[in-house]
């Protein structure tokens, strides 16, 4: 069976917390059945990542949609912590995203229990890309090497683009994915400061997502932003103007 023949993990709606299964394929942000009866997956959303001097900033919009045509949820949290010093942004099908996050967390725990040491970002990204193969999920993985990792460089920030073919690319500055990535990349190109710390990089990430939301119909309804440092992952919500709304809990679990 090829990845294209693989049935959705969410066909019965049991992994659809947004209640959007209504004859079409529920997705973060969208997917639909093709004329041939197969499932086509889109990556309509906006996710961005920025490498800062002391960590990584991840940000996404909050909209879930069906094929970018119908807004099915306006308060989705698309950034998830997967390790004490790492988080993932998610674009793709809800069921597959949930399964991917659970497996990645389990693999990280198993790795550390077997080796008796903390998992480096290099190792986490390798595992993350391997288990993603064939899944309709498009993540950014950002994190900081923890103290006690196998490799040297504790405190070093890393940002990776992962793809469904098992690919893995480390970004040295910033990255954007999803249907709003063109506008977001332009905003990042204009505002990115290579010497900025996490606090300075947060507004840049938020501005990039908001800029994309102005033009991309599959993105919008505010921003989820995560600060990832050696001290952990701190997630917060911003409204459609970028104003702070408090901490974020839950998401694509």
Q: Model-predicted segments: where are they?
A:
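Beta-strand scaffold of nucleotide-dependent catalytic cores
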Residues: 57-61, 70, 160-163
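Solvent-exposed alpha-helices and their adjacent loops that cap or buttress functional pockets
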Residues: 38-43, 48-51, 71-72, 79-82, ...
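A short, polar/proline- and glycine-enriched secondary-structure boundary/capping micro-motif
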Residues: 67-73, 98-102, 170-173, 245-250
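A phosphate-binding glycine/aspartate-rich beta-alpha loop in the early core of alpha/beta enzymes
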Residues: 62, 67-94
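Short, well-ordered beta-strand elements
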Residues: 50, 56-61, 84-92, 171-174
